[in-house]
Design a protein with these regions (language model features):
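Outer-membrane beta-barrel "beta-signal"
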Residues: 285, 302-316
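Detector for outer-membrane/organellar transmembrane beta-barrel domains
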Residues: 142-254
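Residues on the lipid-exposed face of transmembrane beta-strands in outer-membrane beta-barrel proteins
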Residues: 54-60, 96-102, 139-143, 181-187, ...
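Transmembrane beta-barrel strands of outer-membrane/channel proteins
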Residues: 29-37, 68-74, 112-118, 153-159, ...
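Cleavable N-terminal export/targeting peptides
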Residues: 1-30, 63-67
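Outer-membrane beta-barrel proteins
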Residues: 38-42, 77-81, 119-125, 160-166, ...
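Repeated loop/turn-to-beta-strand initiation elements of outer-membrane beta-barrel proteins
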Residues: 25-27, 62-68, 105-112, 147-153, ...
Length: 316
């Protein structure tokens, strides 16, 4: 897994070699750091999760409908400093894929992406806790109703297969199938300004060798307001508001209860500065106040969660 992780990282960095003005290769590379301060579910002296990630895409001008996409990610849990994880777990993710999109009419664009996501979780002793391979099929479309209004939908179907877990966990098969939906609109009301609103839903159906239903579902409305405040600066306000049943999981593993619920809404703001059309800096902060968790035993706990992000977008 580490060899694959390193190889994908080298491929991402190697894409910069094509950043010549006359090259037929175009794309972007986006390094990102995120601090998830969940206070470790309320425990004292807990440290945040540090997320480091590189995402990007690569296109060849002779084949404009095809795009290679990738993500390389590392999560360090319960660690005081970046790359200093001595007590917590570390998760690695490699997420390559290929996307085909085509403009069918002047207003309608159709697309299909195929992605293969590998994840590995290690403890502080570098012992493997689990590996999971996820196959993903992602159809999407966008439709320009007017020059200002666009409708869009993306549906992701996935299958997760777990490997290399402890004998106790391996005795209970926990592969899963699921889907994720984004569907909404974008309205551009001024140059460089837009309002976006998406309905988002994720559903997972866990598989067991000898157990019954085990499902989870999460539903949100996700609005974003983007305001260009100057030639080089943009401010974006966004939210993630739970609707319907919110975030719920049913688990039939012999616990006291079979239902887990979590209520949380996120409020965030991003500050975007364009040094040039090809070099962009983005920093942001978000909070989920008064998160309410109802566990399987019926006990209710409340937390305040915070997220701090920074990323660089380099286009070539």
């Amino acid at each position: 897994m580490r060899k694959v992780y390193l190889l994908t990282g080298l491929m991402a960095l190697a894409s910069l070699a094509y950043a010549e003005n006359n090259s037929k290769w175009t794309g972007q590379i986006v390094p990102r750091v995120e601090i998830e301060d969940l206070n470790n579910y309320g425990k004292d002296e807990a440290h945040p999760t540090w997320v480091t990630k590189i995402t990007g895409n690569l296109k060849y001008k002779d084949y404009p409908n095809w795009t290679f996409i990738y993500e390389l990610r590392q999560d360090e849990y319960n660690t005081p400093h970046l790359f200093d994880n001595v007590d917590g777990n570390t998760k690695y993710r490699v997420y390559p894929g290929i996307k085909y999109s085509r403009k069918v009419t002047d207003k309608l664009t159709l697309g299909l992406a195929l992605r293969d996501r590998w994840q590995l979780l290690e403890n502080s002793k570098e012992e493997t806790q689990w590996k999971v391979n996820s196959y993903r099929i992602i159809p999407n479309f966008s439709y320009n109703v007017t020059d200002k209004l666009e409708l869009h939908t993306q549906v992701m179907f996935f299958k997760d297969i777990f490997y290399d877990r402890s004998p106790e966990k391996s005795a209970k098969q926990r592969n899963l199938t699921g889907y994720e939906i984004y569907s909404g609109f974008t309205y551009r009301f001024a140059p460089g300004c837009f309002f976006l609103a998406d309905y988002w839903e994720e559903s997972n159906d866990f598989e067991h060798d000898n157990l019954g239903d085990d499902k989870s579902k999460h539903q949100q409305i996700r609005p974003t307001l983007s305001l260009k405040v100057s030639e080089k600066n943009t401010v974006e306000f966004y939210g993630r508001f739970q609707i319907l049943n919110g975030e719920m999981k049913r688990d039939n593993e012999g616990k006291v209860g079979t239902k887990y619920e979590r209520e949380r809404d996120r409020y965030g703001v991003d500050f975007i500065h364009r040094f040039s059309p090809n070099f962009i800096l983005n920093v942001g902060v978000a909070t989920e106040p008064n998160v309410k968790v109802k566990n399987y035993d019926g006990k209710v706990s409340k937390y305040d969660w915070f997220y701090y992000t920074g990323r660089i977008v380099y286009k070539f």
